Amino acid sequence: VREAAYLAGALNLLIAGAVFILDLRARRSSEGIKPVEPRRQLVPDAAVSSRAARMALWAIGLSGFCALALEVLWTRALVFFLDNSTHAFTTILTAFLLGIALGSALIARFIDTRKRLLYWLGAVEVLIGIFAILAIPILSSSTPVIQTMARMNPADPMLPWKWMGMRFVTTLGVMLLPTVLIGMTFPIVGKIYTRTIDTVGTALGRVYAVNTLGGVFGSAVAGFALVPLLGVQASVIAVSALNTCIGIALILFDPATARRARIVTVAGSGGLFLVLGAFFLREGALDLTSYTERIDSAEVLSYEEGIGATVKVFRDHYGDKLLSINGFPVAGTPLGLHDAQKPLAHLPLLLSPVPSPKVNLIGFGAGGASWGVLQYDVERVDCVELVPAVPNAAEWFPEINHGVLSEPRFNLIM
């Protein structure tokens, strides 16, 4: 990590040096050239009312809020699909930056020929909301693609790269469409809000500032409020609903669009979003599920999302119960997982010469190690757990923890 940071800093310095050199050459080559007076009016056909400009500015702020909130939520969700938080963040960042670049480039080819810019901005926002809610179910349904990779030759030295590459490309493909749409919003708002050539810098600077400020609040609210209060799946639906509402408001208040066209567009897009949201919530299609869970799970017994992790208890096809954190099975009734907890409790105390020691455990899991420690003459057991949902799942494993949470010598520290 440190070396990568040094490399990034060095590249930034090289870029800065190259820009200074190019600027110096440009100044020398432009000496003696008489500046041309620019046209004052930007594009007469693009002129919109000040009310529409204000609406567009509010929309880009709320759009920035939704975009960065979705980035946080998708990063959290992709940990299940990519099995690695670093890969998840890298994939999301790649999708966002590539999508913004492609979206801006695509809309730039048509923006000067469009008349109803407020309507088109609203349509883009509605599509962002719809595709944002579809992203996680589409990723979840791509498990057969990953199963095909899993059946490849395990002796292939390139298998880890192929495995990671397949998941990266699949995820990038799913996330690219909503991020391309997000990339279209800034040029449209810039076109609406910019009135004359003389005010291009001021207008675009204001649009960029409002969009960035919305993004700051979006990332903070998603991580510190939405996930703890609603969980990831409900937060995705809430943010997608906000995106859709932004689009509906813009379409309804666009004076350049016929009233019938506005009503039909709003009714169709709003109805589609409501149907999708209700279906996915009812069917549990937005539940975060890793490849291992989807292959092994026969029945989900408990599912709880929190700010630290998503904790799930499920029964596999052999009838065993497993506890998974962010998609990784960490404890359960299978013989291998159960036996792995016993040495954690017994070995240190069998070797310790301290009479009646105070014992500290890091991580509760299913509670097997905590119960094992209490079988010895210990004064107290302090167990430190970072994820509140983990001890909440203890009720599903009485055969492992034997009700250790109610033991007077046991102290759970959150």
Residue ranges and their predicted role:
Residues 1-414:
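Alpha-helical transmembrane segments of multi-pass membrane proteins
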